[in-house]
Amino acid sequence: MKHLNLILIILILSCCPLHPVYAFLDKDIRLLTMKDGLADNTIPCIYKDEDGFMWFGTDNGLSRYDGKTIQNFKPANTYVSIAAIVRLSDDFLGIVSDGYLYYFNRKRETFLPIHTESDTAIGVFNVLPADDSSFWGISGNRLILCQWEIQQGKEEEKTAVRVRIQKTFQLLEEKGEVFSSLCYHEKAGSGIWLTTNRGNLILFHPDTPGAYQKIPLTDGKTLQVTSILNRDGVVWVSTIGKGIVRYHTKSGHMDRISYGGTGKENLLSHTDVYQTIFIGNNRYLAVTWGGYTLLMPDEKQPEELTSEIYNNTHTQIYRNLETRMISACYDPNGLLWIGTNGGGVMYSCLLYTSDA
C-alpha cells in the first residue's frame, strides 16, 4: 500500500507544484483510454478509494488504476454498464449496474454472489451507505433500507453476501412518479434528500418518516435528474435539459443555472449536466454534454454565481478531445478526473504556481 501511495504522490507532483491557485485543462491534461487498458472509453462514474486507487465505472465493466497500470473486473462474462460506485465497507464496493447492486471485494479483487430472503435480486438504481452493514436504496417509487452480511463458505469461492430489506418507505403518491437520485443532508443526522422524475425534491427524516418535506422544483413537468449534491446550504440538482436547479435550504429560494442565459451568473457549457462536484475554495465544477463549467460566487454579490466555460477540443498535446463529459471526481490533493462519453478519462492538476 505504501508503494501505491508513493506512485500516486509522484503522479501528483509530476502533474503540478502544490500551490493553492487554480489552473484548468487548457494545457496540462493526461488521458486514459482503452489503449492504456480501460475496459471501455465511456465512463459513467468515477470513485477514489481510501487506499488511493482510482475506480472507473465503464460501459463494459469496472477498471482500477493505481497510477501506473489498469486492471479490469466484471461480475459476469457479459456486457456490463456500470452506473455508480460506492463504498459499502472497508473491504467492499457497491457496484450499480442495470438497476441492480453488485458486491465487489476490493481486497480479494472479486465479485461475490448475493442471496436474498426470497432469492430474488433486489433492484436499486442508486445507493447511499448507512453504515458498514446497511445502505439506503431507491427502487422505483420506494425508498428502502437494506441490511447485509457476509456468509462465509467452507470454500472461499462459496462465500456470498446475504441481503435483506429491513424497512420500506412509500413516499410517492402520484402514479408513475419514481425516485431518481439521493444524497445525505449536509448536516449529519438531518435527513436524506431525494429527487423524483416529476420534479419534486424531498427531505426525508428516517427518525420521523411521516414528516417528510416535499419541494416542487418544476411546475409539474417531468425532470430528468442525473445527480444531487448538498453543500453550504444549497442543494444542487443536475439535470438533462434544464441545467442545474438550486434550492437554498435556509431561505427556500430556488434558482436555475442554464445554457444561453443572460449574464455570467446564468451560463453553462450545455443544458445537459451529468454531475456537479465541489472542488474547494468555494468553487464547483459541472460536467456537461459540451465541456465543463467552473462555477464560483460573484465577488460583488456572493449569493450570485459567475461561470467560466471550458469546451476546447484540443490542447498543446492532444487534438480532438471528447467534450461530452458525463462524470467527475476531485482529489483534494489537486487532481481532477473527468469521465467522457467515448473518449476515456481525462485528468489534470488544478494547481499551479502563481508565478507561472
Task: Tell what function each PLM region has.
Residues 1-356:
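Carboxylate-rich, polar loop motifs that coordinate divalent cations or form catalytic acidic clusters
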